[in-house]
């Protein structure tokens, strides 16, 4: 039976001279890969858009659960990100977003609420201020914590407390080493308790501190996340 679903493009690998395998996260099926054929009659710009990471497509396909690579009948471009192609900071946060989502969602099932959150965040990237763009990846990650069910309990925060990874709460530090992590925990508290966290006046060093804490926390709960390469690019920009 033919099914229509939206999806977010996460990457593409050339399969042949006129086809690529596109990796995505879809609204109806979760992680999904499909073969995209470059039609000779299709305008080159429109065809290339199907391979741009963070593009949003609508596809019609005869979905077969046991088929690793799906074969869509129709594809329609709904949204193509523009700022990452013309702004270095937007490009860096987009690269990070793609790498993070690819690692986190590569074997995930359908989660419509998560998909819709990601769709709106990606579309909203085009309208953020310069300050907001610089913190987009941090806002996205804190939102992911909520949708993945591991958002720390902000009501447990007290000044100089640290994030307890196993409990998902803030607690007093137990050692001098932990005291050094209290500042990053305070930044996380600000982010999860602010209505517009991307507009918080953070320095580059503060963004990198918070990014490391968020990655460590995600890695604790999702060990397959591994070490990402793109944070190094972000640290150089900030």
Task: Label every PLM stretch briefly.
Residues 1-21, 25-238:
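Non-catalytic alpha-helical scaffolds and adjoining flexible linkers that form interface surfaces
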